[in-house]
Amino acid sequence: MFQQFNISRSGFGTYQKMMFNITNNISNAQTPGYKQTRVELATLFPIILQEAEVKYAEDEDLNPYIKKKRGIELGTGVRIEAISTDFSEGNLQVTKNELDVSVRGEGFFQFRKPDGEIVYSRAGNLARDVDGNIISQSGYVLDPPVRIPNNTTKLTIDPEGRVFANVNNEAIPREIGQILLARFSNPDGLKNVGNNFYQETIDSGEPLVEVPGRNAAGQVVQYSIENSNVDIIKEMMDMIMTQKGLELLGKAMQAGEAMLKAGMGMT
C-alpha cells in the first residue's frame, strides 16, 4: 500500500513539473529567440524483491546453457533527470526596426550585466539606452559595447556585424562599432538563467568569440528577429496528455490514501 501511494506521489510531482515546463514554453511562443525546453525522465531505483536463476544460450558448442542470477525488480516511481534546451533555429521574421537583428548560425549575442557578468542570448530585438548604448530588452549592454551617436538618422548593420551610422543626414556613414558572436562547443551545457539568457559552464566550454560570417558563428541579419522555436501544436497536445496523466495519478493517490487509512483502521 505504501509503495503504491509513493509511486503515485512521485509521478504526480513529476507531471506537475512537466506541466509547468509546457506552460512556460507556450507562454514564450512569441518571445524572440526563445528556445523551447524538454523534460527528460528517468526511473527511480527499483526494489529487488528476490533473485532467480535464468538459463540462456551463450555458446552451444562449448557450454550450451549458462545460469545467471537475475533480480525481480519492483518499480518505485519516476523522477526528472534533466531539463534540456532545444537550440535549433527559429524562423526569421522580417521587421521595420533597424535595431532588430537575428543570427543565422550557431552564434549568441553577448551582453554585460550591471555586475560585469557576461550572459548570452539569441534574442536580437535590441534597443538603445539614454546614453546611446545598444542594449537588450532587459537593459544589459551589448558586449563589446556599441554607442549610437546623437542625431543619427540611419543605422546600418552588415552581415559581418559592423555597425554604421549616418549622422545629421551625412551621405557617407561612419563605422561606430562591431557586433561579435559567441559560440560554444557544447551549447547543451549552457545554464538557463531566465529572461532568455544563458551562462557558460564547464560543460558548455568557454565561448569562442568570432566576427559574424566566419566559421560556424553565422551572419547577422538586420531588420529581422528570430522567432521562438516552440511547436505550439505539439505543446498543446502534450498539455492535454499531461493533464490526463495528472488526473489519473490524482485518483491513484486518493485510492492509495484510502487503502492506507483502511489498513490503519482510520475512517
Regions found by a protein language model. Give the residues of each.
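Amphipathic alpha-helical polymerization modules
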Residues: 1-267
